[in-house]
Amino acid sequence: MAKAAVTKRHHFMIQKLLILLSYGYTNGLDDAHSLRCNLTIKDPTPADPLWYEAKCFVGEILILHLSNINKTMTSGDPGETANATEVKKCLTQPLKNLCQKLRNKVSNTKVDTHKTNGYPHLQVTMIYPQSQGRTPSATWEFNISDSYFFTFYTENMSWRSANDESGVIMNKWKDDGEFVKQLKFLIHECSQKMDEFLKQSKEKPRSTSRSPSITQLTSTSPLPPPSHSTSKKGFISVGLIFISLLFAFAFAM
């Protein structure tokens, strides 16, 4: 019994390290040269009628904020450029449509209610790095109630889940052709405008601080395909956590 408890603790520790590994890697991708959109889908209540919210950032700058309550576009930059305005116009309707689709999918997804504590709470992060001459691509991270995690890479149209339970849900979502088309369409439709805006943002002085994405601290999604570029900071984080994993496995033996 004691041995089983120790093993369970080791497995829990390893799971947390894997979460940090995902955070460290993705944080290397998520900087002022990337556009990040955080989407939240939840069950509305009479006290809080909010059921969807979408926020898009470049670095620390909020360039777009949408919800079913506040449908106006906002920006954290008083000196907003024409490129920023074009990006917002391009993203607004596709994001609204996607949030409605996500709401329908969550409502029709069977989950363990003990894990989700009722209606599933969905968090989605889209990260679009500046294409720099490559085929425009993005990473979509899905987090259902901090219990089910999977990722979609538009670059090679691949899906990866954190575990078997997440894989069951992921496989149903990936088989929805209309849904996948929406994820791809948003990137294809707005890639040129996003690249122009990111190029302009890259030339501006920026803060070195970063805020984690909506799913980064909880997502256990696997590493992106090797063709994605990473910063030195991302590699350092991966290296340190890999060493920690080795120690964790050693103690678990």
Curated annotation (Swiss-Prot):
Induction comment: By retinoic acid.
GO MF entry, a single one: natural killer cell lectin-like receptor binding
Domain of life: Eukaryota
Main location: membrane
Biased composition (Low complexity): 211-221
Cysteine disulfide partners in this protein: C37-C56, C90-C190
Gene3D superfamilies xref list: MHC class I-like antigen recognition-like (3.30.500.10)
Signal peptide: 1-28
Family: Belongs to the NKG2D ligand family.
UniProt name for this protein: Retinoic acid early-inducible protein 1-beta
Lineage start: Eukaryota, Metazoa, Chordata, Craniata, Vertebrata
